[in-house]
A protein has these predicted regions:
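Small-residue hinge/turn detector
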Residues: 96-108
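Glycosyltransferase-associated regions of secretory-pathway enzymes
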Residues: 1-95, 113-270
């Protein structure tokens, strides 16, 4: 359901300091965020693909967070982060950071609103790791669109409640707050955090292949038609969810989008 204002109690939240996490796998909770409970047609139809696959009969709970509910979660359970959260110079920084508090407090799966769910995520959730995925396929060599460093996108993340890496991310928000969006809270921030975590010799973060969670790059035409997702599932047999890259910053970059379709995951097998 939609959380319009007050979020439900969060057993895993830290108020006066981090609490020991559950030794458990990722719970079946789907988190998504929108400015209000009133979704546009595009977002509503894509969200429905995910709530249909991940339903109550399968033990799932789908939460739609509003801006108001996100701020209330931070105010209530993460008061030490509230000043940074309120002080962001870009609302998208709040949107990006809110998903970290959701995952720390409740655990589960975070997906951007422009994802379609082609298959159940149940198989990948049998893990105690923090899960992320590559934003580009390993074969990507385009000099402009594929940086030398491999991007880990923050449009999909999954974690057990109170995972240590989620705490690590939250603790890094203050130091990065004044940076540009990409590196303050976005994919650059997440990529750097994964690198820093691993450089310290820590484990518990797993990076899934691009085709598993994204299925198409933002700067190429999507190979699937949104009105025929059954066909899309057949075209992308190794893909669990796929992003149609409908976010506002991606729309601004539409002029840079190439006309050819992304075929990197067509027929790919897990």
């Amino acid at each position: 359901g939609c959380i319009a204002d007050a979020p439900p109690p969060a057993a895993g939240a830290f108020i006066e300091g981090p609490r020991r996490r559950d030794n458990s796998t990722i719970p079946r909770i789907l988190h998504q965020t929108f400015k209000s409970c009133e979704l546009r047609a595009d977002e509503a139809s894509l969200r429905e693909t995910c709530t249909r696959v991940h339903n109550q009969e399968e033990g799932w709970r789908a939460l739609l967070w509003t801006d108001t509910a996100n701020r209330e979660l931070v105010r209530r359970d993460y008061a030490a982060s509230l000043r940074v959260y309120n002080g962001y110079d870009d609302h998208m920084k709040r949107v990006d950071s809110a998903r970290l508090f959701q995952l720390h407090a409740y655990g589960g799966v975070y997906l951007d609103m422009d994802f379609a769910c082609l298959r159940s995520l149940n198989a990948v959730l049998q893990s105690s790791d923090f899960l992320v995925a590559q934003q580009h396929p390993s074969s990507c060599t385009h000099r402009f669109y594929c940086p030398k460093w491999s991007i880990i996108a923050n449009a999909f993340m999954a974690a057990p409640r109170a995972h240590p890496f989620t705490e690590f991310l939250i603790q890094r928000l203050r130091a990065s707050a004044k940076k540009r969006l990409l590196h303050a809270t976005g994919p650059g921030f997440l990529t750097a955090a994964v690198q820093a975590w691993r450089a310290r010799g820590y484990s518990g973060v797993r990076v899934l292949p691009f085709c598993t969670m994204y299925g198409a790059r933002w700067y190429l035409q999507h190979p699937c038609n949104r009105s025929s997702l059954d066909a899309c599932a057949r075209q992308l047999p190794a893909t669990l969810t796929t992003s149609f890259w409908l976010g506002s910053w991606k729309k601004k970059a539409a002029s840079e989008k190439l006309s050819r379709p992304d075929v990197s995951c067509l027929g790919a097998h897990a």
